[in-house]
């Protein structure tokens, strides 16, 4: 019997449509043919029900289902007893829970749909864990007995007896304006319980928007406002679900410092974050989550920050001796040797002149530069320094006011552009969209294997474009952008809405595609780990955001990063195992050493 329970059946509620099919799953099931009720479904039922006790894991129903609505997944054997929560029959289940410790920041890292938000809800006391018994849920006494002997027992006892107050900063900040009315200052005044309003507004740069209505805020401003609203209240448990989306590098670090400032000896702070360098900077320890998205999720034991992130990147949990991803990710040391004169001659293919552009009271000056084939140029700068403006001038969508230099014309480039904000207007399925926009590439086997397979576009093919989630839209937009034949690919924030695993995949896809297609890509990216992984050269933006900025000419990764980080006043070191960049804690020995040596970005170990 022990063998039988190690698999779970997942029936996707939005794909299973018994009215439109011939109940192939039930007709083909060998257990049903012997007269047992393994799969129960009638034309009138909403969903097929699969009994996990009777299922023998043959996988025939998975192949026969015309809508691909069924997954049968074999679980690791030792997971039978640790179920924390299951939403219903044939749905997602979560194993174990992350263990928060008072006075420390717990970071959670894992793919989307693997139970991070479920875990947050349970830890906030908003969702009562049912230990997998969704028909007869246990009472709290039994739940406490289940967790006895672990730190979670004390935690839940405190939640029940002391009525700990938990506040969650939601993941989707763009839904906030629907719920909150009024202007920023008023809302903060209502919530202010710690007399920190002035300090928080200065830290999170909210003073410019203090009189604005909440519904008129941009994404980044909403995010900072949401962080401020949580941080200004008094609570024992603070939870932040993705506090860095929409923010630029400087604001990410500011937000991280604000989150860390909430620590008190008996308070808990829990953060879900996909930008690994920010997570590294924020947390004191980390729990990874692995499993199958939408099917089951497992929380590992807590690790130290460095170990946890390295485990996640390596895709292997040593304590459980379990591999949860096929390939690991390491970072190359991207320092090109001095090129010889002939190579430079053959390389300098495209030039653009020095340009200026004024929009309203914002002035952007671009120094002349050149770039070559098979190169990825990453643009580094805060929000509002004119990165998108520069991209649009290269694309020929905006005319510069003034150009100077020997070749004053901007050469004509064929450009494929993925904008920062993606809004779905197409009234049909993803398949139609790809067919209409990029028919040639989407049929091409190399494009299939280089771009569409890794980004998992196949699963989205029959969904309506308007119903896609943020991350799914982002992947479709990336596919469309790379599928269009062009000389230059301009990609604005490819990591927004993607989870940490998809970011790794997306950066690999962009890199491989640019190398194979021998084209150039300009990428704007705020996730530091992605930016370092992608960049061959960097363009640094300096100046006052939204007032007067300068874009330097493309330079090598080392000198560019050094210049950029010196503006931000932070230093990076490299992790010895997989060479990922790690932020040094402010005023640590290493931080002071590197600042005095002037090497903010460390490449040589």
Curated annotation (Swiss-Prot):
Domain 4Fe-4S ferredoxin-type intervals: 46-75
| Induction section of the entry | In plants undergoing RNA interference.
Q: Where is the ABC transporter domain?
A: 70-315, 344-568
Checking Gene3D superfamilies in the record gives: P-loop containing nucleotide triphosphate hydrolases
Pfam families according to UniProt: ABC_tran (PF00005), Fer4 (PF00037), Fer4_RLI (PF04068)
Q: Which GO terms describe its cellular component?
A: cytosol; membrane
Q: What GO molecular-function term can you cite, just one?
A: metal ion binding
Show the PROSITE patterns listed in the entry. 4FE4S_FER_1 (PS00198), 4FE4S_FER_2 (PS51379), ABC_TRANSPORTER_1 (PS00211), ABC_TRANSPORTER_2 (PS50893)
Compartment(s) where it occurs, according to its Swiss-Prot or TrEMBL record = Membrane
Please list the residues that bind ATP: 110-117, 381-388
UniProt similarity note: Belongs to the ABC transporter superfamily. ABCE family.
Report the NCBIfam families cross-referenced here: PRK13409.1
Annotated protein name in UniProt:
ABC transporter E family member 2
What taxonomic ancestry is recorded?
A: Eukaryota, Viridiplantae, Streptophyta, Embryophyta, Tracheophyta
């Amino acid at each position: 019997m022990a063998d039988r329970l190690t698999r779970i059946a997942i029936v996707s509620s939005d794909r299973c449509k018994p009215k439109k099919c011939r109940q192939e799953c039930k007709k083909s099931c060998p257990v049903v043919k012997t007269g047992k009720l393994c799969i129960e479904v009638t034309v009138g039922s909403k969903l097929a029900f699969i009994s996990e006790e009777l299922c023998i894991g043959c996988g025939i129903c998975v192949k026969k289902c015309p809508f691909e609505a069924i997954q049968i997944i074999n679980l690791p054997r030792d997971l039978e007893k640790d179920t924390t929560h299951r939403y219903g029959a044939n749905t997602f289940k979560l194993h174990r829970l992350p263990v928060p410790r008072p006075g420390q920041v717990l970071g959670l890292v894992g793919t989307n749909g693997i139970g991070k938000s479920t875990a947050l809800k349970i830890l906030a006391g908003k969702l009562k864990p049912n230990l997998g018994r969704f028909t007869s849920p246990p009472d709290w006494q039994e739940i406490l007995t289940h967790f006895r002997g672990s730190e979670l027992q004390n935690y839940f006892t405190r939640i029940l007896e002391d009525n700990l107050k938990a506040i969650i900063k939601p993941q989707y900040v763009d839904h906030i304006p629907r719920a909150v009315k009024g202007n920023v200052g008023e809302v903060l005044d209502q919530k202010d319980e710690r007399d920190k309003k002035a300090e928080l507004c200065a830290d999170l740069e909210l003073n410019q928007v203090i009189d604005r209505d909440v519904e008129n805020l941009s994404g980044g401003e909403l995010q900072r406002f949401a962080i401020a609203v949580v941080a200004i209240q008094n609570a024992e448990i603070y939870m932040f679900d993705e506090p860095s989306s929409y923010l630029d590098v400087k604001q990410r670090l500011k937000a991280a410092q604000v989150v860390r400032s909430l620590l008190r000896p008996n308070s808990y702070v829990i953060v879900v974050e996909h930008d690994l360098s920010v997570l590294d900077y924020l947390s004191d320890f980390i729990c990874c989550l692995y499993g199958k998205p939408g099917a089951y999720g497992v929380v590992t034991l807590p690790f130290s920050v460095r170990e946890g992130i390295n485990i996640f990147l390596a895709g292997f949990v040593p304590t459980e001796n379990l591999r949860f991803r096929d390939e690991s990710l390491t970072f190359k040391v991207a320092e090109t040797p001095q090129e010889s004169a002939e190579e430079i001659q053959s390389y300098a293919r495209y030039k653009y002149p020095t340009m200026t552009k004024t929009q309203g009271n914002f002035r952007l000056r671009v120094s002349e530069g050149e770039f070559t084939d098979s190169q990825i140029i990453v643009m580094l700068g805060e929000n509002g320094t004119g990165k998108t403006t520069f991209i649009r001038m290269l694309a020929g969508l905006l005319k510069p006011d003034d150009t100077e230099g020997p070749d004053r014309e901007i050469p004509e480039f064929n450009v494929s552009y993925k904008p920062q904000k993606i809004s779905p207007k197409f009234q049909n399925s993803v398949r139609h969209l790809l067919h209409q926009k990029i028919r040639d590439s989407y049929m091409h086997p190399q494009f299939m294997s280089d771009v569409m397979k890794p980004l998992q576009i196949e699963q989205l093919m029959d969904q309506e474009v308007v119903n896609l989630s943020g991350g799914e839209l982002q992947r479709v937009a990336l596919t469309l952008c790379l599928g269009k034949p062009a000389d230059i690919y301009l990609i604005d924030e490819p990591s927004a809405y993607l989870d940490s695993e998809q970011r790794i995949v997306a950066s690999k896809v962009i890199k491989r595609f640019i190398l194979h297609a021998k084209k150039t890509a300009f990428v704007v990216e705020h996730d530091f780990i992605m930016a370092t992984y992608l960049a061959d050269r960097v363009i640094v933006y300096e100046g006052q955001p939204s007032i007067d900025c300068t874009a330097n000419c493309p330079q090598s990764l080392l000198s560019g990063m050094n210049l950029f980080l010196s503006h931000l006043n932070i230093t990076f070191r490299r992790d010895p195992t997989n060479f990922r960049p790690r932020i040094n804690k402010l005023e640590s020995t290493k931080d002071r050493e590197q600042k005095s040596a002037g090497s903010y970005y460390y490449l040589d170990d």
